[in-house]
Design a protein with these regions (language model features):
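Short, Lys/Arg-enriched, disordered terminal segments
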Residues: 1-15, 23, 129-131, 153-156, ...
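Acyl-donor-binding surface of acyltransferase catalytic domains
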Residues: 89-153, 240-244, 254-288
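Soluble sensory domains of the PAS superfamily and closely related sensory modules
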Residues: 49-51, 107, 191-193
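Conserved donor-binding loop and adjoining core beta-sheet/short helix segment
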Residues: 28-98, 204-234
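Intrinsically disordered, low-complexity segments enriched in Gly and acidic/Ser/Thr residues
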Residues: 174-250, 254
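Short beta-strand micro-motifs in enzyme catalytic cores
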Residues: 56-58, 79-81, 137-141, 198-200, ...
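N-terminal cationic-hydrophobic initiation segments that often serve targeting/anchoring roles
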Residues: 50, 104, 245-249
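Short amphipathic alpha-helix that is part of the acyltransferase structural core
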Residues: 1-41, 151-182
Length: 288
């Protein structure tokens, strides 16, 4: 069964949950095996989730034994259910099934986003067997800026601004179903949060050919994506990626993470990224 965690529960089982996070077969994304997030970060995240109004921590209990820890959150305006932690020692199928049933009455018409490393085969195989939709699959890489030396990049690359915003919007919003569309990015760029977004545009003969968008958080720099006017282009990707990394190092960022496709792997490896694991994202729609 699933039980809402009390503060005492958190103190009792925090180490247990962290230990599960150190195994790709028993944990989910965000991963704590990336060499970036620490045990202290895990603890801070748990207590933060406990105190927020849009997140909860649940314990999975079977035969009076705690076997799992779910730290989830919701975004009401987007009908979005996601996870900070989904660490299950065993009985993964039962836990996923229970969480879906638990959520149906509490979050009708929401969509649950389950992100797992491919190593977590029990969870993934169960999601494949039910009415879920696989919407993403990527290879996860990280880079330490302490070990990164700035590289030369080609092309006419500029920061996004009010004059070229329409160029960016037209290119970026060609993909209609992404969460970080141009409207959300515009609001994020102009917000006063502790996350600083950056967007660079790659021009050829005054025509926008590609763009990269990434964010500085208190913990790391995260690259969210690279868009192209036409087909995937290795030179454009490499140039935008180097511009992003050079800028981030200059801004004293410490680490970065990047989720890439198979065709992009050799490019990120050539500039110093290290492979962590493969990521798979599944959704469940909580509709009647």
């Amino acid at each position: 069964m699933l039980k809402k965690a009390t503060l005492q529960d958190i103190e009792n089982y925090l180490d247990f949950s962290y230990n599960l996070s150190q195994d790709l077969t028993t944990s989910a994304f965000p991963t704590y095996l990336d060499g970036i997030k620490t045990k202290n970060d895990f603890y801070k995240s748990a207590y933060s989730s406990f105190s927020k109004s849009n997140s909860k921590i649940l314990l999975f209990i079977n035969n009076d034994e705690v076997l799992g820890w779910i730290d989830y959150y919701w975004i009401e305006q987007d009908h979005y259910l996601g996870f900070n932690v989904f660490n299950i020692q065993n009985n993964q199928q039962e836990v996923i099934e229970e969480f879906i049933e638990y959520s149906k009455s509490r979050y009708p018409n929401y969509t649950i986003y389950f992100g797992f490393p491919s190593d977590n085969t029990l969870s993934i195989e169960y999601l494949k067997s039910i009415d879920s939709e696989k919407i993403d699959e990527n290879y996860v890489y990280t880079l330490s800026f302490e070990k990164y030396s700035p590289l030369e990049c080609d092309g006419d690359i500029v920061s996004v601004n009010i004059e070229n915003w329409n160029d960016f919007r037209d290119l970026h919003d060609k993909t209609s179903d992404i969460y970080w569309n141009s409207d959300r990015l515009f609001n994020a760029l102009n917000s006063k949060s502790n996350k600083k977004w950056n967007i660079f545009l790659y021009y050829e003969k005054n025509i926008l050919k590609g763009c990269i968008y990434f964010v500085y958080t208190p913990l790391l720099m995260e690259i969210f994506g690279i868009d192209y006017k036409d087909d995937f282009d290795e030179n454009i990707m490499r140039s935008l990626l180097i511009k992003c990394l050079n800028t981030s190092k200059l801004d004293n960022q410490k680490h970065t993470t990047f989720f890439v496709e198979e065709k992009e792997r050799k490019i990120v490896e050539s500039v110093g990224f290290n492979f962590i694991t493969k990521y798979e994202l599944y959704t469940i729609s909580l509709t009647d």
